[in-house]
């Protein structure tokens, strides 16, 4: 009778043991795989992070967030150790923020050549893009004209050279496109003003 009981327990116990062992192995694999992916994400450079952005599906939703993303790309261009190939990719990313009208007068090759010259000049002069800020969301001006929606706001950025730190203020004009995305129509230098930041 004892032999029958042991055989029955072994028959019932073996599948339970195999199920538990399988769960432990699957859990261990999942844990190791997740940690490897987390490590890979943590080791990305700012350039890699920016270039991995999917603006077709995750476009900035407000005029301020578009301008801040533009500033983030500029800071990457002028502070990161990048190649000319990465510079071109970053310039192409910037152009995804541009209105069709601005793209028409700034085709990629022209815009890239201009950015390349400026980037090389920054490097030669040891100019550092020290930081940037944009107006508070509550300071963004919006209006409608000829059925289109427009917005404007000021972005401040500072440049550091051997001579000291200089401040630049640019007023950005944006327009909503057919997909309801705010696109940069242009920008111009403006006079220093009190910038209200968040």
Locate predicted features.
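Amphipathic, hydrophobic N-terminal targeting peptides for secretion and organelle import
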Residues: 1-48
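Short beta-strand edge/turn micro-motifs at domain boundaries
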Residues: 4, 37-41, 165-198
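Short low-complexity stretches enriched in small and charged residues
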Residues: 24-30, 50, 104-111, 126-132, ...
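Core segments of small alpha/beta cavity-forming domains
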Residues: 46-124
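A generic structural signal for short coil/turn motifs at secondary-structure boundaries
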Residues: 80, 161-162
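A mature extracytoplasmic/lumenal domain signature
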Residues: 109, 136, 155-159, 172, ...
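Surface-exposed, charged secondary-structure patches
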Residues: 113-161
């Amino acid at each position: 009778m004892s032999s029958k009981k042991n055989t029955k327990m072994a028959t019932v116990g073996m599948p339970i043991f195999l199920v538990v062992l399988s769960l432990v192995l699957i859990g261990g694999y999942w844990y190791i795989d997740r940690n490897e992916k987390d490590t890979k994400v943590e080791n990305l450079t700012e350039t890699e992070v920016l270039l991995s952005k999917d603006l077709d599906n995750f476009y900035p939703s407000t005029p301020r967030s578009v301008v801040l993303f533009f500033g983030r790309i500029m800071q990457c261009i002028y502070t990161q150790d990048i190649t000319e190939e990465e510079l071109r990719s970053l310039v192409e990313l910037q152009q995804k923020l541009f209105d069709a009208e601005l793209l028409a007068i700034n085709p990629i090759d022209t815009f890239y050549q201009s950015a390349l010259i400026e980037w090389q000049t920054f490097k030669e002069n040891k100019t550092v893009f020290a930081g940037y800020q944009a107006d508070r969301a509550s300071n963004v001006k919006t209006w409608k004209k000829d059925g289109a929606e427009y917005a404007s706001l000021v972005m401040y950025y500072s440049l550091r050279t051997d001579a000291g730190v200089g401040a630049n203020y640019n007023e950005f004009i944006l327009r909503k496109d057919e997909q309801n995305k705010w696109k940069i129509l242009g920008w111009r230098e403006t006079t220093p003003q009190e910038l209200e930041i968040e």
